[in-house]
Amino acid sequence: MDEQITGGYSEPCGQCAAVDWGVSDEGQFFCKSCHNVIEKIREVEDVTSLHHKHGRISIVRKPKKKKHDSEREWLVCEGFQFILKHQAKALVSLGVCMKFETEVLWNFWKRYLQNTRQAFTENPVSTARFEVFMKSQSGSESDTQSHQSCYSEASSDTEMSVSGISVDGRSAVSSESLHSIPQKGRRGRVSNLMSMPRTLAMCYLALLWVREAITLTDLLRMVAEGHIPYLHLHETFPAEMRMFGKDVQIFRVLFFPSYAFIKKEALVLAKIMKLPSFPTISQDCLFHPVPLTVRYLLEANLPDALHVWVQKVITGAGMDSDSFLTFDPTDKKPHLLSYDVQAVAVIIVAMKLLFKLDDHVEWKLSHDAAKKKNNKVFSLERWFNIVQPVLEQARLKEEQEEARRQWNFANPFITNLKRKSLVLKKRRVTDHLQQRFQKFADPAPEQSTSTTNSHTSFRFSWGEEEGSDGPSMFNQNLDCTVKAKAVNGLANQRYWHPELRICPENKCVSHFSKFEPSLPRMFVWVLDLFSFILGVLQSDVYEEVLNVERRFLKKNYRLDSRLTSSHLKKKKGPIL
């Protein structure tokens, strides 16, 4: 029987050079001398065809892919543990204490794995019920793939994935990772599984626990500048952790997460890990608004004399108490403060107290300061003329660096073997065009300073030293703004603010875009300055300013005559 099928095939064996072929039960050709299996076409007649005398069906059966000795099945949580380890080492190299890496972050990670039942538990997350569900959705999948699809949450009606992309049961695991399955369920509920943004959220929680002087905006900026590994970090995985299929979506980074998103993820992680109350934020901690506002006064080139009024706002709003500042995940409604955004919001409220920022009073006070022979008097107009061009130049530089950022991977991800050649061809064409256009546009592009210079917490440098952005105004006084003979000590006797009505719970949205056209231009510019310094949206700073004003006015209206007027008038909202 074998001779009839192999009679027309006389090619020698590639292993032993013999011409003695047989056909296995699966239709594969094999050498009877050395038992070498080849990918030979077996031709059979198709009797159902109209031209069955000449019709033939070609059947090719490829041998199963052999697993290399260096490869092994690995868990997705192993990949995230590898990422957290590298991020922690980068933070320690930047000056963070060793306790952050060896004790706090490791304990957080262990609590996370235990509470999500991925490790350190006798009842792991892979349940028999979930495996049965996957088999019912894809009967053609092998038993091995069904057992691999176990990275799920123990919920009653959801199907989870680490990648955050919903897929059906038929597209189960096609990679070396055990846990590459959908993270969102049929009802779209977010699971407790780890993601790339959540690695940053966990690092931030650990930094907050050890009370390191690194705010969330500092962390995100270090990530964007490449000082903390985040982009293309999967390329440093060990050789045995080969990525393919759904693993691509898990570790793929297409953009940097926003401030608000990381803060939200930090709250979720704190709830998952069931963390106790964090260490107290006292005045000796740099997360406290008193020392933190000094930093941002230096950053914005504002006078140190303004800090006296900043402290009055902090005290008047009750924002210096330990209970208000300390993060406690055990509360019924835990609230994680935006310490950095809150600090600049306090500065803006203090500036409104002194200069009003209504496009009239601040310029009048600046003209009065210009008449003084003493150059140590702070003029807001001069401050604006110094800071504005520096801000525009820094913004342009940031846009250029963002345009140069390489989001593509050194080695393209292959999600489907059938598309491998197409993906590789597209990458070759893209790289070729990029090189050609780069030579045409800029023969010698400047290397980004963010990857060559050491990290600094300040965006601007003010002073008389070489390389500074402009003259410093930190030591100037506020003689034209603070009047000793005035009713409340301020040249500005009125305080304006937008509507302070609080939105209903769970329906709160930013109203900045709605009110921005009617707001004074100087106030909007100050919002823009501090939003650039922090790397957040103007709306984030605006909403935090409203929060500070609500607390400050609620506690001081008609109670503190030194900071409020005795009459309430209406002009652009309530006037104090």
From Swiss-Prot:
GO molecular function ontology, one term from the record: zinc ion binding
Annotated region described as Disordered, given as residue ranges: 137-157
One Pfam family it belongs to: Rrn7_cyclin_N
Subcellular location: Nucleus, Nucleolus
Coiled-coil ranges (or none): none
GO process annotations (BP): nucleolar large rRNA transcription by RNA polymerase I; RNA polymerase I preinitiation complex assembly
Residue numbers spanned by region N-terminal cyclin fold: 74-246
Residues reported to bind Zn(2+): 13, 16, 31, 34
Keyword Transcription regulation found: yes
InterPro entries: Rrn7_cyclin_C, Rrn7_cyclin_N, TAF1B/Rrn7, TF_Rrn7_Zf
Region (B-linker): 71-73
ZnF (RRN7-type) ranges: 6-39
Protein name: TATA box-binding protein-associated factor RNA polymerase I subunit B
